[in-house]
Amino acid sequence: GGEAMMIKLADGLKPERSNSFSGSVDWAFNLGHFSSNLLIEGFYTMLNDVFYLEETGFDETTGTKIQERRNGHGARVYGANIDYKIAHGKEAQLQLGFTVQQSRYTEALAWSSDPDVAPTKRMTRTPDCYGYFTFTSAPLKNFDFSVSGVYTGSMLVGHSAGSGVETPVAVNTPKFMEMNLKLAYDFPVSKSFTLQVNGGIQNLTNSYQKDFDKSWNRDSNYIYGPSLPRSYYAGVKVVY
């Protein structure tokens, strides 16, 4: 729920170690007046004595819930990502990337202390795919803008019993596509002094979690996805 929590280290806790392997191809080329760069990368990571948390009870004095950090058997994280950049000077620049990966424990681990909840090999809060893009342009001498986006694929998130659900459940979250817009205009005051006025919208698509827990016994850890709903902002910047 929303109560405080204490994390203790298990006796004989070993350090988590990893071995990683990766390979990539990086290609720079021109498309007419545009310069481009393409990067393709593959990766594989083996984690040994991987850390995980397990509930062990409550502190008798404060009533604080206690979780213990323990060693699991291991985990594997592997996948591939692609990044692409294309630019035409300062007039227009585009950068985008996408990653596909698998994050799995070698043996299933319990994410809840409830014995009726099945353990899982899938790492929680780790999407199997995610990506981004950023487009910036300065079509006028004193005006520029940018459009960016972040894609987060579905992930597994534990939802503990409380005001939201009566029994613990592992939730496959929805996918999110967060879009952002920023506009800026420069007002030259003198040769060495410029006043910039800017504004924009964060999370233009309002891609945001819709099922927050409420009340005193909420699961305060049941939070996922973009950190803010649709938000507007404006600012002034002095450049000299």
Which stretches of residues belong to each language-model region?
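Outer-membrane beta-barrel translocator domains and adjoining extracellular loop/strand segments
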Residues: 1-3, 50-58, 101, 105-115, ...
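Surface-exposed loop/turn segments flanking beta-strands in extracellular/periplasmic regions
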Residues: 1-8, 55-70, 115-118, 217-223
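Membrane-embedded beta-barrel scaffold of Gram-negative outer-membrane proteins
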Residues: 12-70, 76, 197
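Residues on the lipid-exposed face of transmembrane beta-strands in outer-membrane beta-barrel proteins
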Residues: 13, 23-27, 80-86, 96, ...
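Residues that define the transmembrane beta-barrel architecture of outer-membrane proteins
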Residues: 17-21, 74-78, 125-131, 175-179, ...
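Short loop/turn motifs that connect adjacent beta-strands in outer-membrane beta-barrel proteins
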Residues: 30-36, 89-91, 142, 188-195
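Gram-negative outer-membrane beta-barrel transporters
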Residues: 37-47, 64-161
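C-terminal beta-signal and adjacent terminal beta-strands/loops
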Residues: 48-49, 150-160, 185-240
